[in-house]
Swiss-Prot record:
Origin: domain of life: Eukaryota
Organism: Conus ammiralis (Admiral cone)
Domain notes: The presence of a 'disulfide through disulfide knot' structurally defines this protein as a knottin.
Major subcellular site: secreted
Protein keywords: Calcium channel impairing toxin, Cleavage on pair of basic residues, Disulfide bond, Ion channel impairing toxin, Knottin, Neurotoxin, Presynaptic neurotoxin, Secreted, Signal, Toxin, Voltage-gated calcium channel impairing toxin
Subcellular location: Secreted
Disulfide bonds: 52-67, 59-71, 66-76
Name listed for the protein in its UniProt record: Omega-conotoxin-like Ai6.2
């Protein structure tokens, strides 16, 4: 019983901590929902539809979009 109470309190604390330290730039949840709504209207804008760069293709070192996330000297490995 005590362990259950401790676990519940820990989960509540971590949830509150997550919301307290979350990056709330701009409108917070309102901004998130409007972005999701835009992605539903325009499926091509969704990040899930972006193709990853295959091994041996050119990539960006700063923001790699390689399928395995390894970009060395402008090439995915």
């Amino acid at each position: 019983m005590k362990l259950t109470c401790v676990m519940i309190i820990a989960v509540l604390f971590l949830t509150a901590w997550t919301f307290a330290t979350a990056d709330d730039s701009g409108n917070g949840l309102e901004n998130l929902f409007s972005k999701a709504h835009h992605e539903m209207k325009n499926p091509k804008a969704s990040k899930l539809n972006k193709r990853c760069t295959q091994s041996g293709e050119l990539c960006d070192v700063i923001d790699p979009d390689c399928c395995n996330n390894f970009c060395i000297i402008f090439f995915c490995i």
